[in-house]
Amino acid sequence: MNAQPGTPPRESVRLVSRRDVRLVNRAGHVYICSSTGTLRVPQRNPELSELEGDIGLEFLPDDVIAGLRSRTLVHSASDAPLSHPLYDTGGPGATRPAVVVGEGPLADGVAERLRRAGAEAVRAPAPDRSADPGALVLPLHGEETLLRRWTERAMEARAPILTHLSSPTRLLFAVLDPPRTACPVCLVRRLRANHTWQPIADLPLDVLYGAAESDRWPTTAIAAAMLAHQTMAALTRGTSGPAELLEVDHATLVTTRHPALHTPLCPACAPVAAPPEPAEPPAVDPESCWGRMRRAVDPLTGLVAEVRVRDADREPGNSTTHVLTAGHPTTTWFSPVQASSCSGAVKYDPTLARVCAVGEFMERYAAGVYDPDRLVRASFRKLGAAAVDPRSLPLASEREYAALSRIAPFDPDLELDWVEGRSLTTGQVRYVPACAVYVPYRFPRRRERLIDPISTGLAAGSGPHHATLGGLLEVVERDAVAVFWENRLALPTLDLGGLTGGPAAAIVERLTAAGVQVLCKDLTTDLGIPAVSVRYVEGPADRPMVAHATSAHLDLHGALLGALEEADLCRTGLRSWLAERDIPGVDDIELDRSDFYTYYCGPGRLSLVPFWDEGPLRPLPAPSPAPASYQAAVEEVVRRLAARGHEPIAVDITPVDVAECGVRVVRSVVPGLCPITLRRDFRRRGGRRLYEAPVRMGLRAAPLTEDELNPYPLPLG
């Protein structure tokens, strides 16, 4: 039977239950049932001891009423119109109107449902400063200039933006809170940059995505209800956490979540958006890194459409995992150049392989995203001592200048673009030529083309020290292989028989069992930072597959493992390239990137570089202790470089969207060290170290002349 009020213990004071709440007295307890769960409290009212069934609030003691009010299960009768388990009547925007932009059945439906829920809904065709919006409902397919003005108005009012695009088959919407999150302009530019068919990506967004609505369509009514609901939640509860673009499939009602990342150089929110700077972890944890970085992988709004894992025949504990990224944004939607998009990794740890593949993409993406207006425009002479002398990068030799009209000799009075970096030895600001930071880089004038931009020194990491370390070690690696290759040095061969257990031993054992010849050279130079180069040779003598790779590390064992893994990645690429294209001729000058990998796969090509097989056999040293942190590792590398007179410089080029994925990208530059190039006719032989390092290392009695340097191309890997 239902309990009757009888004589209530106290008079109800204009309180009512939320509409989804039921109070049931049963078995000595009062059960509070609602859509958010069920609570149970002991029965303390004597009048309820012999009654069971539904009861009213008047039978509950004050402390229970207070608890229910704190959970929004009970509220003042005056709040009844807004009462809902997902809405908070005391939220930041509850007293301000929702501004609904646009005309048509969808906007009409959203405004009407908001009013029925008790909220104030205002229609506005254009940004109006007289209104103080608590939330903004904004179609995503408006003109960018209008989206920008609305975004600026919302940021002034500190109001969340519910932006949307509705079609008969799906609804796209996001609750944004710029500048904390991306803004609608960010989202539009990202959607365009990721669109499959770039020739039409500039069409109005409603055309690209088939936006349409009708008051006869249930899908329009569904979209209006969902948008009104999300607006009510934003009005009454505010926003928090990372933003997402939700995609609701009307056929299946399946919801897919896409990351809503800031777009670099957004004209609406970039001036006030602050990239996140989380604390740098002391060591790389692949799982936690991947947990942050996987936000970058999404076909609609990500930096990378997908990650492809090639490990179908992987043997757990005895093999490597090969990962490639696929589907990359057209960065010319927000940068003057198209960033390089190829990236991949081979690692013993499958999660680390994913992290490194996406990290490599982020390096190249970051290096292709810049604003020319933010560069420092000045001559070397005008900047003075704060500027890095471009001749120390180094530049071309006199002979190379004479042979190449596209490369211009350096003029100290010529205005160039510069990027602000920081010296790792003094902490002072140093200006680095933009062409040595960004790749690709658009030279404003032909006479400013001092070099062909390359990626050496680019690195992504979980923090600034991690990224700086990776970049510095890559610079050291490239310097070591350039000195070795150009001077055709007979350097020690590492005795791999000393490997006992661990990933490096497993890789060598697997490859050797497959008939691959594995040769490892110790390329460590006078800098004292270990560098190892690896060569794999397999297949018939008339068509061998030859893979090369080099790596540097503070521990020679770390350099060895890095080179072995990188060469494994190179093997995978070689299989595709050798199947698709011819091997370049011995004397071919014009080579593309893949030619530098395949050049030594031609018959008899290894005989051109006999020094690879020369040099003493050297046992592996004992492993070196790891530094306590990335910062300590950077300091040790800097110490060794400074001891040889080199000043390393770091330039943080992290775009905001990369930072939102927990990654930093740094370009490390070490003036004076030797670079590599992707040109056979331009090797930047103008620096002295290329000639003098072998003498300092005791490997040459006198420097070689330029005529005596190796004429054959350096293999990539």
Label each PLM-derived region with a short phrase:
Residues A154, C183, A228-T231, A559:
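Hydrophobic structural packing positions in well-ordered secondary structure
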Residues L60, G67-S70, G241-G717:
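Helix-biased "structured C-terminal domain" signature
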Residues A121-P133:
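Short acidic low-complexity segments
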Residues P133-A223, P267-A270:
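E1/E1-like adenylate-forming module used to activate ubiquitin-like modifiers
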Residues R153-T169, L235-L253:
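Short, charged low-complexity linear segments at domain edges
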Residues M1-C33, E277, E306-R310, P336, ...:
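Long terminal accessory regions outside catalytic cores
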Residues N2-Q4, R26-H29, S34-E120, V175-D177, ...:
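Long, charge-rich, low-complexity alpha-helical segments
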Residues A221-S240:
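Internal hydrophobic alpha-helix adjacent to the cofactor/substrate pocket in enzyme cavities
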